[in-house]
Amino acid sequence: RGLGDVYKRQIKDGRYLTNKARGVGVYQNSDNMLNLKSFEAGLTNLSKEQFPTKSYVFREGQILSKDTVENWLDRKTKDNPDGLNPEDNGKKEADKRNPIYVQQIEEQDYMQEKDGKLSLAGVTIGIGMNQKDYYQKEEYGATYTTDISTEKMKEEGQKAAATILARLRQKSEIGNDTPILICMFKQAPNDSLVGGSFYAYALSKNGTSISSWTDTDIKSVVLPATDSSSVPNENDATSFSAFMNKTQSFFPNLAGVTAQAQYKGKELQGMHVNITTQFYSMTEITSFTQFVSQMARTYLPSGVPVDITIKGSDGTVQAFLSRDSGQNSYYTHVFNSY
């Protein structure tokens, strides 16, 4: 992927500033790391519309500490009055217990230069909401699931957003007038082959009220699709199936060809293809990579960014192909071992 539309990063005293709540997201998404990838990438993309890369410098979140975020994500108790999730009502039945609604929170800071100094000019907060809450009735016991309706998820998300906004306004570095972009994310279930997606955002230019929410209309789908009607554009599903069939028929030693595609409405925004092989020789991998490049140019949708990762059955990345939205040909790289 080209590095055209990316933020400059803030470096302080020759060191990169890591997020103060670093590691919380990994723990919160340990059962489906695709959620974390989709969450972080999507959050930065939504921020670009509000805080353009030409005018702002990116800083990892420095205002919310790890302890603060962990307390907010926990249940509300006497010892933790700041918990955004409801207190445990003691019930064990899936439809009677109080589920965990808010699963993850991430802060991103956007800086601008004034008089040779960088100062905070905007904050983005991502809030990840559960559609399913997984729990055990006893320690180390079986895992059960509470389903959360879309309506309830959105209602609890707006409550959490209002509380977080009010708390951020009390932070001295943010104050009353720093724009805060709040982005709402729907977590994918643990067994999903794609990460979740952002469903709404709101901008607070100042104060603690959120005047309106904007729907993103973003959706992630897995290809090949078991039901083509679940893909916003059926032509993309057909194109991918042709690519998959050609690729698999040419090389018999393939374990699988899948893709994650992201849509905004019916418009494809990008695609990441994963191919698992059982190749061992360098010549096989190189020949296969050349073939995949030709098939991708022929069959995969044009005009959008596409990444293709070729992995061995042990998970080792053997080759990588990439094409930006304005390009026809693919950049390819085969990983040698020395």
PLM regions: where:
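A short interface-forming secondary-structure element
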Residues: 138-153, 271-285
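N-proximal, solvent-exposed amphipathic alpha-helical segments enriched in charged/polar residues
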Residues: 8-134, 150, 154, 158, ...
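Extended, H/D-rich, highly charged conserved domains that either
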Residues: 167-179, 187-195
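Hydrophilic extracytoplasmic domains
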Residues: 228-233, 240, 244-338
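Short, non-transmembrane amphipathic alpha-helical segments
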Residues: 146-174, 283-305
